[in-house]
Regions:
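Bacterial lipoprotein signal-peptidase II cleavage site
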Residues: 28-36
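Short Lys/Arg-enriched alpha/beta "domain-start" segment
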Residues: 36-72
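A short, structured surface patch at a secondary-structure boundary
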Residues: 92-193, 197-204
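Basic- and aromatic-lined ligand-binding clefts that recognize polyanionic substrates
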Residues: 131-144, 245, 249-305
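C-terminal motif of bacterial Sec signal peptides marking the signal peptidase cleavage site
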Residues: 24-26
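Structured C-terminal subdomain patch of bacterial secreted/periplasmic proteins
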Residues: 48-53, 229-258, 337-413
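Short helix-initiation/N-cap motifs at beta->coil->alpha
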Residues: 176-188, 313-329
């Protein structure tokens, strides 16, 4: 090959090498707790920010923080908490999803030095400061569980949308004010009301501009991943996070320990061998089911049933979402022979009757559960009742056994 030919081929070779590297890396960019830093992960299950985490721990030690107890979670896998000491005060390093780093500081601890030393590496949360903007509505039950309703100052939903009576009453009495939905918050109301923290669900990741705006206004943002846990007790353990944040640690830990024992008792319920399909229908009658590793299938198993889609996974390997969209044809192949159907109505509302269900799609009429009259829908408050998981499982066991549910499920006639 001539020198001239080699010179012309080099750019193409270089571009091919770059393309190959990018293809093999399969990198995705995920935000850390700060506003500018990013970490990279090769696979969705890979450890996120491991090297950065080690550097952070080393930096904490260098800056005079003495590491104490790391709490051993009983079931939860999406958060960790470690105690630290500085100036005689106890602080808590909360790590969520391996890359969101929060330092929870006592109300009387000066955070100026920490903010200067760590910048975007840590999100600072002042413990028990109140005026929390709760935009992750499923977490309301955790505040109820640890007696921390008074720490909520703002809500992303209106009183009528709360199933938790204490929150509904607090909003009616103007103790908690509506401050806009998570995707369009009332920034002026939040700043005027001195919001101390925004607690968001992972939906905020679809509106990154909102998160950035809150941070620029000086409102720290914490993203909750409790619904990504694979068992009800793991999801319930997140009450500890909210107990620490609000200064109600003892109440939270005591509540979890008591409820965990109740769930352990529930695990002894009789196994029936009956199959259960748990799903929802959107406005276009598309079917949404839970992946086999989600906490809902785990609850069905504890209730004595067998989940109809135990091996189902999200086809998007980059997604952590526990929900999977199915074509009706694919859903029908499995669901037509299931013994029991449970329809999640927390988003789209009540189906009302079997005839209304079959009107949505005539193929429902050919399904065993429909023919046998074993179709149920969830109550509106089930999504906001993570702190009552043991009661939900017991209620689920009742309907699997052919008995009437006490609260959380209603048979369609």
């Amino acid at each position: 090959m001539s020198q001239k030919t080699r010179d012309h081929s080099m750019p193409a070779v270089f571009l091919l090498l770059i393309s190959a590297c990018l293809l093999l890396s399969s990198c995705s960019i995920l935000p850390t707790s700060g506003t500018k830093q990013y970490v990279y992960t090769e696979q969705k299950k890979a450890s996120i920010g491991t090297r950065n985490e080690k550097e952070l721990l080393k930096k904490l030690s260098t800056n005079g923080f003495t590491e104490g107890t790391t709490y051993q979670n009983t079931a939860a896998t999406h958060f960790s908490v470690t105690e630290y000491k500085k100036y005689g005060k106890t602080l808590y390093l909360l790590v969520i999803e391996g890359n969101q780093n929060y330092l929870i500081c006592p109300f009387d601890f000066s955070t100026d030095e920490v903010k200067k030393d760590f910048g975007d590496e840590l999100t600072i949360i002042n413990q028990g400061q109140g005026n929390i903007y709760l935009a992750a509505t499923a977490c309301g039950s955790f505040f109820r569980a640890c007696n921390a309703i008074d720490d909520i100052g703002f809500s992303s939903i209106r009183p009528a949308d709360w199933s938790i009576s204490q929150l509904k009453v607090a909003m009616d009495n103007k103790q908690i004010r509506f401050a806009g939905k998570y995707s369009a918050p009332d920034y002026e109301r939040l700043t005027d009301g001195k919001a101390s923290l925004a607690i968001e669900s992972t939906m905020i990741l679809h509106t990154p501009a909102v998160r950035e705006k809150l941070l620029k206004l000086g409102i720290p943002v914490m993203i909750d991943y409790s619904s990504y846990e694979s068992t009800p007790e793991a999801r319930l353990e997140w009450v500890k996070v909210y107990g620490i944040i609000t200064g109600h640690k003892n109440e939270a830990f005591r509540f979890f320990n008591e409820k965990y024992k109740n769930i352990e008792k529930v695990n002894q319920l009789e196994k029936t061998g009956k199959s259960v399909a748990y799903f929802s229908l959107d406005a276009e009658n598309n079917v949404v089911v839970r992946s086999g590793s989600d906490y809902i299938p785990a609850m069905i198993e504890r209730a004595g049933g067998e989940y109809a889609f135990p091996d189902l996974k999200n086809p998007d390997s980059d997604s952590h979402s526990p929900t999977v969209n199915l074509s009706f044809e694919d859903f029908y192949k499995t669901a037509r022979d299931t013994d029991i159907m449970i329809i999640n109505t927390t988003i789209e509302g009540s189906i009302g009757s079997l005839s209304s269900l079959t009107d949505r799609n005539s193929l429902f009429s050919d399904m065993k559960a429909v023919r046998d009259g074993n179709v149920y829908e969830t109550s509106a408050d089930i999504y906001q009742s993570a702190d009552e998981s043991d009661q939900i499982i017991n209620d689920m066991h009742r309907i699997i056994k052919g008995k009437k549910a006490k609260k959380y499920f209603k048979r369609l006639d």
